[in-house]
Amino acid sequence: MENFRKVRSEEAPAGCGAEGGGPGSGPFADLAPGAVHMRVKEGSKIRNLMAFATASMAQPATRAIVFSGCGRATTKTVTCAEILKRRLAGLHQVTRLRYRSVREVWQSLPPGPTQGQTPGEPAASLSVLKNVPGLAILLSKDALDPRQPGYQPPNPHPGPSSPPAAPASKRSLGEPAAGEGSAKRSQPEPGVADEDQTA
């Protein structure tokens, strides 16, 4: 593919796991109309996504939120969902994996001047159909069916799993380090050191 360059990339029609905008589309077809859909992209800033998601979920009318991303944005999608689960306790989660079909069109680069080549010759093009993995994570304040695949119950202990370590206090120059106490430091005997230097 070194002699080709990508001209365009488009979502293939029909048969793909659409993230569509209408009701009944996407991986969670039975969502309430007030659910928020966050489309996470590769260039999205997590702080911007989280600010909007947290503000949306703080409203009593919002009962569910869906984070969806595909390709290189899947890790960012998981990160957003995990941050929101830590900020808001008691969220039920359902995770769905799907694939999107993407058609890429590549065009050959014009070769250098060679003998026998016609200057107006059209460039060859190549079409590639790729299945790009995508992830959709539903977080809901309401209980969900625990028998459906990808279900995770709310975390019983919100927050970090272990308490943060207490910061070590600074010591004065004259104080011994922790664990040294008042023990004497071993010093060489005066006679032994003199013998080593004279030898």
Swiss-Prot record:
The keyword Transferase does not apply. GO terms for biological process: rRNA processing; tRNA 5'-leader removal. One of its GO terms (cellular component) is nucleolus. The modification Phosphoserine is found at residues 172, 182. Gene3D superfamilies: Alba-like domain. One of its GO terms (molecular function) is RNA binding. The keyword RNA-binding applies. Keywords: Nucleus, Phosphoprotein, RNA-binding, rRNA processing, tRNA processing. It holds the Pfam family Alba. Coiled coil: none annotated. Residues 1-28, 144-199 are annotated as: Disordered. Residues 151-166 have a biased composition (Pro residues). Residues 1-11 have a biased composition (Basic and acidic residues). InterPro entries: Alba-like_dom_sf, Alba-like_NAB, DNA/RNA-bd_Alba-like. It is found in: Nucleus, Nucleolus. Belongs to the histone-like Alba family. PANTHER family: RIBONUCLEASE P PROTEIN SUBUNIT P25, RIBONUCLEASE P SUBUNIT P25. Component of nuclear RNase P and RNase MRP ribonucleoproteins. RNase P consists of a catalytic RNA moiety and 10 different protein chains; POP1, POP4, POP5, POP7, RPP14, RPP21, RPP25, RPP30, RPP38 and RPP40. Within the RNase P complex, POP1, POP7 and RPP25 form the 'finger' subcomplex, POP5, RPP14, RPP40 and homodimeric RPP30 form the 'palm' subcomplex, and RPP21, POP4 and RPP38 form the 'wrist' subcomplex. All subunits of the RNase P complex interact with the catalytic RNA. Several subunits of RNase P are also part of the RNase MRP complex. Component of ribonuclease P, a ribonucleoprotein complex that generates mature tRNA molecules by cleaving their 5'-ends. Also a component of the MRP ribonuclease complex, which cleaves pre-rRNA sequences. This is Ribonuclease P protein subunit p25. It comes from Homo sapiens (Human). The gene is RPP25.
